[in-house]
């Protein structure tokens, strides 16, 4: 059974970071300097796991009345199982419960359809965020 937790412990955060390292740095070739930032120390991290270990992660950054969601990563063996949707639904519910009016994210162009299915709408042009991967800003209301 998959459980999604707020990653408040050192162990849970380490598992979030290990998933991000596997997905973004090892699989996608993103430079470590691009992956880790100051927001990691102050944001809320979420971790989906089961008895086999960590499976997915995401983080939420408070920006006024907007919740910025990012670093959504699903372990290779868990892709296509609905777990990405499950962790996003959880994070969106947490943001709504926290009083945020809007959710925003910067989606890799290859997964825009995934976020559209969750109610996000793409805005503006595609851009390279410095990682060499094209992104678009996406938003959705939380009310």
What is the predicted role of each segment?
Residues 88, 95-108:
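Conserved GNAT acetyl-CoA-binding A-motif
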Residues 47, 53-61, 66-73:
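Conserved beta-strand in the GNAT
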Residues 74, 80-93:
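Conserved acetyl-CoA-binding loop-helix of GNAT-fold acetyltransferases
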Residues 1-45, 49-55, 141:
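Short amphipathic alpha-helix that is part of the acyltransferase structural core
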Residues 20, 115, 120:
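Conserved active-site tyrosine of GNAT-family acetyltransferases
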Residues 104-106, 121-139:
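Conserved catalytic-core motifs of GNAT/GCN5-like acyltransferases
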Residues 62-70, 79-80, 130-135:
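A conserved beta-turn-beta hairpin within the catalytic core of GNAT-like acetyltransferases
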